[in-house]
Structure formats: C-alpha cells, structure tokens
C-alpha cells in the first residue's frame, strides 16, 4: 500500500510542477499564490511530501482549477 501512496504522491508532484512551469511560475510564485511555504511546494513536487486535502485545495485555487482536476493524474507517467 505504501508504494501506491508514494507513486500517487510522485504523480501529483509531477503534475503540480508541470502546471507551474506551464504557467511560468516559480515555486515561490506558487507558494505565495497558495499561501504556502516555498519549501513545501518543492517537497510536494519531488514526491517527498504527501499534501493534505487543504493544501491541494490551496494549490488548485492558485491554478484556478478544481481539486479533482488537479489530482487527476491518469495522464502522468513516472
């Protein structure tokens, strides 16, 4: 079960990084927009941290999307 959780965290992190770079945002820009710490964004993007629902909601709002769209990682490859 842990490996599935780790894979999901990694995929979510990859998607967040892809969305962030597509919008030409730095980690600091995203952190400020979402009201989070820049180090937290980095840890999430590297798959080192599993973001809470509240954190995902803040990130989704910063990207002007719904949480469900943010966590849809069906097209993200590791």
Q: What residues fall within each predicted segment?
A:
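Short, charged recognition helix plus adjacent turn
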Residues: 1-7, 71-78
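A short, Lys/Arg-rich alpha-helix, primarily the initiator
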Residues: 1-22
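Alpha-helical residues within the helix-turn-helix
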Residues: 21, 32, 61
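Short alpha-helical DNA-recognition segment
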Residues: 24-43
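Key DNA-contact positions within bacterial/archaeal DNA-binding proteins
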Residues: 39, 49, 68
């Amino acid at each position: 079960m842990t490996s599935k959780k780790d894979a999901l965290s990694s995929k979510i992190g990859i998607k967040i990084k892809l969305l962030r770079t597509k919008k030409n945002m730095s980690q600091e820009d995203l952190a400020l927009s979402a009201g989070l710490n820049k180090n937290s964004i980095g840890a999430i993007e590297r798959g080192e941290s599993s973001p809470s629902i509240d954190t995902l909601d803040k990130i989704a709002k910063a990207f002007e999307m719904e949480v469900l769209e943010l966590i849809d990682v069906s097209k993200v490859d590791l």
